[in-house]
């Protein structure tokens, strides 16, 4: 009787122990960061102005103008409003380098890529590309000047 129970236990445990191994897939761990995760420092007024001027005119702003505009920005409490006014003044000056609307519409993909690199100093994500292509398709009245203004006033542009 003991032998039968012992034999039964051995058979039971050997059957229970025989299990097909599940395949193990090795996965490489990747560190995923947001596209702008490292942009966490707010630009100072002089940094914002000099970078904005360089992005719009493709040349450096004179030190005298930089000091004058920086003092103007620092004297006003609403930074968003003053940034809009300064940007508007820059856009009305001669020498702003903006692609024409017809050139923008001719190759939207290239325009969007270059705008991201110019203002955000990074590559565009596929989701952003798809969004802008759909946006331009549904809004034919949007000009390249409007796009440049939107990028210049965006939250991401305020940080480095």
Task: Enumerate the predicted regions with their spans.
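Intrinsic disorder/low-structure terminal segments
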Residues: 11-12, 147
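Sec-dependent N-terminal signal peptides
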Residues: 6-9
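C-terminal motif of bacterial Sec signal peptides marking the signal peptidase cleavage site
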Residues: 14-17
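Positively charged n-region of N-terminal signal peptides that target proteins for export
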Residues: 1-4
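Substrate/cofactor-recognition hotspot
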Residues: 19-160
